Amino acid sequence: MIALATGPRYRVPFRRRREGKTNYYKRRELIKADAPRLVARKTLNHNIAQIVDFAPHGDVTLASAHSIELRNKFGWKGHCGNTPAAYLTGYLCGLRALERGIERAVIDIGLHRPVRGSRVFAMLKGALDAGMDIPHGEEVLPPEDRIRGEHIANLARQIKEEDPEEYERRFSKYLERGLKPEELPEHFEEVKSKIEEEFGGA
């Protein structure tokens, strides 16, 4: 039998806090920043970046990008839930924000743990490289080689040399889409260039 908390001091947490969706203390601090938020969220297979502003009637999304767009619109053949895809999602969101005249934001990672080099910070790095001004510490950003997927390419080369069958099994989705995983860094640059072209870049 579960004992229920009782007494005058007991306070029921807000529903979204109980559901693990909102940290209201962090949300209040973000409101004080008086700037839109770069909301970075990740799932097992995808990354989502949004520029969101507070409003009395509820949050307003000013610009957004979803990693599935990388595949459907820009020909991304890698996994949509990895670090390179997270960076490109943040980059795309940042360019869309700038196109709408939004230059400054604060990072909002929600209830995700602030792990250095994680996908939420790869999205931050993408938005920064797009040209946005977002306060941050350099130490949380993933290194360039990880953003480009060098770690995935190196792992693929090693497995291919040691166990070709395991290589075929582990990277089957890459191969089905016509991409050798060891060529992911070059593919990353190709997709990034396509995104830049969408916004008039070279």
Swiss-Prot record:
SUPFAM superfamilies: Translational machinery components (SSF53137)
InterPro entries found in the cross-reference section: Rbsml_uL18_euk (IPR005485)
GO BP: any one term: translation
Ribonucleoprotein is among the record's keywords: yes
Pfam family, one: Ribosomal_L5e
This protein's UniProt keywords: Ribonucleoprotein, Ribosomal protein, RNA-binding, rRNA-binding
Name of this chain's protein: Large ribosomal subunit protein uL18
